[in-house]
């Protein structure tokens, strides 16, 4: 009983921790121009995804950071990118693609300094990185910036005929708002080949997928310093942990793709998610799930739909996957972060009055620790 009362404040702060022990979710919460829903499921031994929503009376900011090689880079981006963005917004007097790029550049530069400071004690930090997806809604403008293969997909009203050519009925249309920087796409491979005409191994098909230098699938990120700064990959200290990578120049960048457009009345919602979701669901399938179901818990519903698909591919049930422990579960699906932002155009002015200050919602750094026996033991030891 006492343990349960200890957990109640955790649930109020972080959301619900039920059913799937590796899933966390917050069903519904207001932002400056609507509601949002967020859910995360952990597959790796340490959660490598991070997600956050920051809302003020005048703007909403969304971040999804999908780490690789470890959780350090995504956690770093989670703590540093929005402070940089806020600083440049204040300096420049507003949000713009240039301001967003400055924030990405500053975050990359700060992480590089961290790697240099930590290098001798932890050389592996040069091999960690993170995809970075950011959305910003201010007034009637939407900005989406991306590094890597997390994705933002907007759902907007469309019309179509009912069955057998019947009356027009309201449908939802998926509009991709971000650019995937993954060498699975032919245009990304071509871009790399054009940039590295003297390197016949710049993109290699290995272990069933295309990879840069046979190592990594994404071409843009925060971190991955050893693939951006050749001196790190050549250092004997680093080579104790990772095989040397012969580089003449950087093979990855931190140059974000940025898109901005005015929001329209037919724009209903935006799904921001790490690639763990998009590996299992198409853009159209995802927006139809959101369109056809209640708002509360919709991010959790999307995550569960993805997990059902992952289970089906292995001729399993989702209930079977739920029983698999962290780490081993990564063989069945990736960490998944989903944030659904609803756009209530007519309610924007009333929302301003309800949100009198900044409100930040972040997914837990590690979900397993919030659900585990170790967490219960820790609470008992403090009691």
Q: Residue locations for each model-derived region?
A:
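PP2C/PPM-type serine/threonine phosphatase catalytic core
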Residues: 1-383
